[in-house]
Every structure is written in structure tokens, then in C-alpha cells.
């Protein structure tokens, strides 16, 4: 494994505001879908292999910083602050407060970085802690001349789709790529307005979301993050094994079914429940007059349907039937009615804070609760700031609570392999490694070409 015993020195901290300041600050309301998110931050980082020769990290920092100031003109929400209104609901103060920007140095070479254990090698070392604002950025120069760009986003303001839009636009501006039509984000909250009158009649939503009377309890068992490499052949084989009666399931459905079943097989008490949630982006299901309207929408457009079964049931059920359960779960939101109903449901219950039910694991009756979020459209190759595509990149989301979080992403090798970020109880991470070592390979430098050229 790589090295986690290294030091990061912050050389300078700045606040980067939009290069064209706003004439008047204003308040941007959160949509009803934003209001379903508790105060959570998520991180993302990108590793770039560089040579020490002809490499000036200071110039690279300035390039990124200048491009950030330009990008924030369009993505102005990221330069604001989350405040609370008289009802206690969050809203976005667009005041061009700016983004905390850290210049740092780490005394380690990229190929020695322990990517398998991001909790101790990446989180809060190469990805900054966000103390103020909506977004924080850190650019870290490495001993080998490489660079790591890390970002932390306030999830109440942006989902991963929104973050990806920003990252691609930021990189295009940095490399002065005039051949790419930079996306102009849409902050039209009216696109997600509730209907008048609200038309909520979906009992599925009542069973999927719960109200919070107090903040979620701190977990008894601290969850751990690990990153794995999965070969495309194993992914295809899982899909083949889960196909029955000609009903082909998606790779994500088959992977989720396999993970759900594997974790259940480690349970001792067959009566305990095992829950699986799948994050669904609603942009394709909220059609408006313009085909690009929701495509460019910046904010949260997510729902997390979940399904559950007993440990004993999952042990006895063939993988194909487990994949059918996952597919049926997703069918509940794969229609044009779910998201408008969810928006109306939130409106009917405001200002009560609701949260997806699967996030609140029942410690007495649940063996495990896991949420899988697809990062397979992670635009890794497009986050090129001018010195080449990233040699590695991943989202990092240690989101608290006792519900696990899993995100598969494309390998930088562009060969169909996956990088999978997993944030689970240690016993469950050990379990998948023990029961499926042919699938879950701890990520090491040997899977990635991270050695600098001189």
C-alpha cells in the first residue's frame, strides 16, 4: 500500500471572489429538493502527474486561481454563503463572499500516495475542510512535481452533477479552450416550483422520507473509507450472472445487487434487515419546454428510493432475483410523476426538515444500510487545467451517520474498469474483500500510471 505518513504545509490562504463583482447582493431560495439535504459537505480531488523539470507550481496555482475567479461569474452561487431565514430554513446569500483557496505543499510523491485509505491520506490533507462559504479549494504541489486539486462543496447547494458542470467549465477557462461551449448554469428555481394546488398522492414518498425532530445521532461504529479497483471483465460477468429470462439489468443494478447480497451474507441474525438505497438524478424526468433547461440546472435534483429485505432472504435469493428487487425499487422513481410529487410533498410539510429514510439506520433491527450513487458519468478527462488530463480522480463523501455510501466511477485508464469509493463499517469492508477478492482490488499505484516522467 502507499504512504499515509506525510506532511502537508499550507503556504498561503486567499479568498477568491468572482472577477466581476455583483452590484447588489441577493438571496437565492433553496428549492424543495435542496431542502431535503442536511448540512453535509462532499469532496472531490484530482491527481496530475508532473515532472519537476520546467514545472512551476506557483504559475499553476495562479492559472487555476485566475480561472476560478472567472468561472465564479457564472457559477455565482458557489461564491455565496448559506444563511437561515425566519422559518429556520437555509437559503443562499449571493454576496460574492468568495471561495477559500489554499496553496499547499506535500512532502510525498504521487506514486507513493495511499489512495486505498483516503480517510488518512486525502481527506482533510489534500481536500480542504470547508469552514466558510459554499466551496473551498486546495492546490497541493507534490515532491515529484505533481499536483493535486481538491475541492469541498456544500451539498445543500450542489449535487455531483452540478459540481461536475462547474469543474468542467473551470478547467476549460483555465486552459483557454475556445473550442468548447462553456455551460452557463441555470439557477431558475421556478423549474422546481410546487404545483398549485399541490398534488401529492404518492404513499411511496411517505415511506421513503422521514422528518427529523433532532439532528441524526452520532454513529456508534465509525465508518471507514476505502477505494477499490474493479476490472471490466468482473463487472460484465456480474451483469451476465444477474441476467435471467432475458431481462438484462444495468451494470449499476447488478453491482448494487451483488454488494447488497454480499453484505447480507456476512450477517449472523437472519431476521435483521439489510437496506439498499440508490441515488437517482431527476433531470431527465423533469421535462420542460427547452431540452437544455434541466440539463444546465444547478442545484439538487435527487431522490433516493430504497428497498429492504431480511438477511436470511438475501442469503437464499439468487443474484438475478436480487437484481430484480433493485430494478423494481428504481421503477418507483423512473417516471414523470415522482419528482413533481416529491416537490409537492416537501411543500406540504415545510418548514419541517425531512431526510431520506435510508440515511437513518435502525441500530437495533438493521444489519446494514447502504446507499449507492452512480459516478459513472464523472467527467474525469475533461478536468484538464492545461497540463493534461487527471491521472486519477475520485469523489470523497464521509457523510456521517451509520449508513454506508458507495460510488463507482470510471477508471482513468478508459478501458471500462471502475474505481469504487466505499464508505462502510470496517467489518463490511473486510467482508467484501474476503468474500470477493477477485472483484474488489484495493487501489494501489500498480493499477494507475502515476510515476512522473523526467
Swiss-Prot record:
InterPro entries: CAT-like_dom_sf, Plant_Fungal_Acyltransferase. Pfam families: Transferase. One of its GO terms (molecular function) is alcohol O-acyltransferase activity. The active site is at 155 (proton acceptor), 384 (proton acceptor). Transmembrane segments: none annotated. Confined to flowers, mostly in petals limbs. Disruption phenotype: Suppression of isoeugenol biosynthesis and reduction of several floral volatiles including phenylacetaldehyde, phenylethyl alcohol, phenyl-ethyl acetate, phenylethyl benzoate and benzyl acetate, but increased accumulation of homovanillic acid and coniferyl aldehyde. GO terms for biological process: circadian rhythm; green leaf volatile biosynthetic process; phenylpropanoid biosynthetic process; response to ethylene. Induction: Up-regulated by EOBII. Circadian-regulation with peak levels occurring at the end of the light period and during the night in flowers. Repressed by ethylene, especially following pollination. Optimum pH is 6. Larger substrate spectrum at pH 7.5, with a lower activity, thought. Keywords: Acyltransferase, Phenylpropanoid metabolism, Transferase. Belongs to the plant acyltransferase family. Monomer. PANTHER family: HXXXD-TYPE ACYL-TRANSFERASE FAMILY PROTEIN, TRICHOTHECENE 3-O-ACETYLTRANSFERASE. This is Coniferyl alcohol acyltransferase. It comes from Petunia hybrida. The gene is CFAT.
Amino acid at each position: 500500500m502507499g504512504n499515509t505518513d506525510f506532511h502537508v504545509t499550507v503556504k498561503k490562504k486567499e479568498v477568491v471572489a468572482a472577477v466581476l463583482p455583483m452590484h447588489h447582493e441577493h438571496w437565492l431560495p433553496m428549492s424543495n429538493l435542496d431542502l431535503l439535504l442536511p448540512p453535509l459537505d462532499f469532496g472531490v480531488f484530482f491527481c496530475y502527474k508532473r515532472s519537476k523539470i520546467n514545472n512551476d507550481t506557483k504559475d499553476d496555482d495562479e492559472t487555476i486561481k485566475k480561472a476560478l475567479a472567472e468561472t465564479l461569474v457564472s457559477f455565482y452561487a458557489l461564491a455565496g454563503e448559506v444563511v437561515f431565514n425566519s422559518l429556520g430554513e437555509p437559503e443562499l446569500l449571493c454576496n460574492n463572499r468568495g471561495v477559500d483557496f489554499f496553496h499547499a505543499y506535500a512532502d510525498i510523491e504521487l506514486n507513493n500516495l495511499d489512495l486505498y485509505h483516503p480517510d488518512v491520506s486525502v481527506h482533510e490533507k489534500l481536500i480542504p475542510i470547508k469552514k466558510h462559504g459554499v466551496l473551498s479549494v486546495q492546490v497541493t504541489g507534490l515532491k515529484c512535481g505533481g499536483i493535486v486539486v481538491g475541492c469541498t462543496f456544500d451539498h445543500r447547494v450542489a449535487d455531483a452533477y452540478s459540481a461536475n458542470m462547474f469543474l468542467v467549465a473551470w478547467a476549460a477557462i483555465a486552459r483557454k479552450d475556445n473550442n468548447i461551449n462553456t455551460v452557463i448554469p441555470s439557477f431558475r428555481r421556478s423549474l422546481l416550483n410546487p404545483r398549485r394546488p399541490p398534488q401529492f398522492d404518492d404513499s411511496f414518498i411517505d415511506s421513503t422520507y422521514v422528518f427529523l425532530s433532532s439532528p441524526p445521532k452520532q454513529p456508534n461504529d465509525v465508518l471507514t473509507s476505502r477505494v477499490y479497483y474493479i476490472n471490466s471483465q468482473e463487472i460484465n460477468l456480474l451483469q451476465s450472472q444477474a441476467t435471467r429470462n432475458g431481462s438484462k439489468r444495468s451494470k449499476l443494478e447488478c453491482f448494487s445487487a451483488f454488494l447488497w447480497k454480499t453484505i447480507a451474507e456476512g450477517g449472523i441474525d437472519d431476521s435483521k434487515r439489510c437496506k439498499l438505497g440508490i441515488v437517482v438524478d431527476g433531470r431527465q424526468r423533469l421535462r420542460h419546454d427547452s431540452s437544455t433547461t434541466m440539463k444546465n440546472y444547478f442545484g439538487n435534483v435527487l431522490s433516493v428510493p430504497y428497498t429492504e429485505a431480511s438477511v436470511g432472504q438475501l442469503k437464499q435469493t439468487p443474484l438475478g432475483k436480487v437484481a430484480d428487487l433493485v430494478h423494481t425499487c428504481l421503477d418507483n422513481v423512473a417516471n414523470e410523476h415522482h419528482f413533481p410529487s416529491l416537490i409537492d410533498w416537501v411543500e406540504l410539510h415545510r418548514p419541517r426538515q425531512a431526510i431520506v429514510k435510508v440515511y437513518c439506520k435502525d441500530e437495533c433491527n438493521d444489519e446494514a444500510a447502504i446507499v449507492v450513487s452512480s459516478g459513472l458519468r464523472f467527467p474525469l478527462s475533461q478536468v484538464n487545467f492545461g497540463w493534461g488530463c487527471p491521472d486519477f480522480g475520485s469523489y470523497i463523501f464521509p457523510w456521517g451517520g451509520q449508513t454506508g455510501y458507495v460510488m463507482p466511477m470510471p477508471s482513468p485508464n478508459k478501458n471500462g474498469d471502475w474505481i469504487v469509493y466505499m464508505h462502510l463499517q470496517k467489518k463490511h469492508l473486510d467482508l467484501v474483500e474476503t468474500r470477493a477478492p477477485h472483484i474488489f482490488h484495493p487501489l494501489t499505484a500498480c493499477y494507475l500510471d502515476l510515476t512522473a516522467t523526467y
